[in-house]
Amino acid sequence: MGVLNEFKAFAVKGNVVDMAVGIIIGAAFGKIVSSFVGDVIMPPLGLLIGGVDFSDLAITLKAAEGDVPAVVLAYGKFIQTVIDFVIVAFAIFMGVKAINKLKREEAVAPTTPPVPSAEETLLTEIRDLLKTQNQNRLP
């Protein structure tokens, strides 16, 4: 039972749960960006450069023979993937930049010193009284 309890404690830690949520949201965000690039950005871009469908751009290295498919370099799909990456990287950069700005604002905000406890206040008063007594005794 010890291993099971240790795993349970590990799995419910904030960092592990936060990481899992981040991975799930990141995967969903990646799908959204892929659709945005493939369905929204690339068609008008292809139209502007002469009606080219980027996903069909490829160099055939060896033609198909019978049941053997053609060997191609699908550089159009690669271009779409690069654009996906650039958009995701930019979105992550902007998110990290916003988080860092919030952290800097929190760090700059002045913190009020904690109110001393009654015991600390009493000890401070005793210390001050002893200092004044010692100063009065010295010639």
UniProtKB/Swiss-Prot annotation:
Pfam families: MscL. The keyword Membrane applies. One of its GO terms (molecular function) is mechanosensitive monoatomic ion channel activity. Keywords: Cell inner membrane, Cell membrane, Ion channel, Ion transport, Membrane, Transmembrane, Transmembrane helix, Transport. The chain crosses the membrane at residues 9-29, 79-99. GO terms for cellular component: plasma membrane. InterPro entries: Mechanosensitive_channel_CS, MS_channel, MSC/AndL, MscL_channel. This is Large-conductance mechanosensitive channel. It comes from Pseudomonas putida (strain ATCC 700007 / DSM 6899 / JCM 31910 / BCRC 17059 / LMG 24140 / F1). The gene is mscL.
